[in-house]
């Protein structure tokens, strides 16, 4: 499975315009062959974070063409070109079955961290973070990849409250593994304001 993460910055006062564009124009036009799921949140003022899951790189390339067409329409809304990172998901698991439908309201945490060695970072997440996921209540899905020296991990929850129960456990593990990271991990958190699952997502899917 392949993931694309898009971080965009809206101009001051234009965040609602960006949200409306994504809801009403972008998502309907971004469906391409191989698309599994898409979602957007607003984790910080004027920051828009999108996550897209696809079957493979070929699907991601098709999505990239559609994405660029949409970005071209946003010159008066975005503060600059979005940051786009994409790659093969190396760790991932679905904890709840989800049907193909439009989705809003999920709470998502996406953590970015510069790392010196991708394999060491992956082993840490596999051995220390995924056991926390496996015991968590209200977790919908989680995954991990490294793109150009930056580790990206994500988890989707029923609610912010469910996520907050386990965040201290994440932080405890992260604080004991500072040597893995070139700089402190940065977490983006927010509620999905626009999203869609294009297929039924099965529990246990990896």
Locations of regions flagged by a protein language model:
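Short S/T/G/P-rich N-terminal loop/turn motif that feeds into the first structured element of a domain
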Residues: 1-49, 53-72, 76-206
């Amino acid at each position: 499975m392949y993931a694309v993460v898009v971080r965009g910055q809206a101009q001051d006062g234009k965040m609602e315009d960006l949200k409306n564009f994504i809801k009403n124009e972008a998502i309907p036009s971004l469906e391409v062959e191989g698309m599994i799921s898409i979602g957007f949140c607003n984790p910080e003022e004027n920051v828009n974070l999108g996550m897209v899951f696809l079957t493979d790189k070929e699907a991601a390339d098709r999505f990239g063409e559609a994405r660029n067409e949409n970005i071209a329409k946003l010159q008066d809304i975005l503060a600059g070109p979005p940051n786009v990172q994409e790659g093969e998901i190396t760790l991932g698991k679905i904890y709840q079955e989800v049907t193909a439908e439009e989705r809003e309201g999920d709470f998502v945490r996406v953590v970015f961290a510069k790392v010196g060695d991708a394999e060491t970072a992956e082993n840490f997440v596999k051995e220390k973070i995924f056991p926390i996921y496996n015991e968590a209540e209200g977790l919908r899905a989680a995954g991990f990849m490294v793109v150009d020296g930056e580790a990206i991990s994500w988890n989707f929850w029923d609610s912010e409250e469910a996520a907050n129960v386990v965040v201290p456990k994440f932080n405890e593990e992260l604080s004991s593994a500072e040597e893995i990271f070139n700089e402190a991990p940065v977490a983006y958190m927010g509620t999905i304001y626009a999203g869609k699952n294009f297929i039924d997502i099965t529990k246990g899917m990896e």
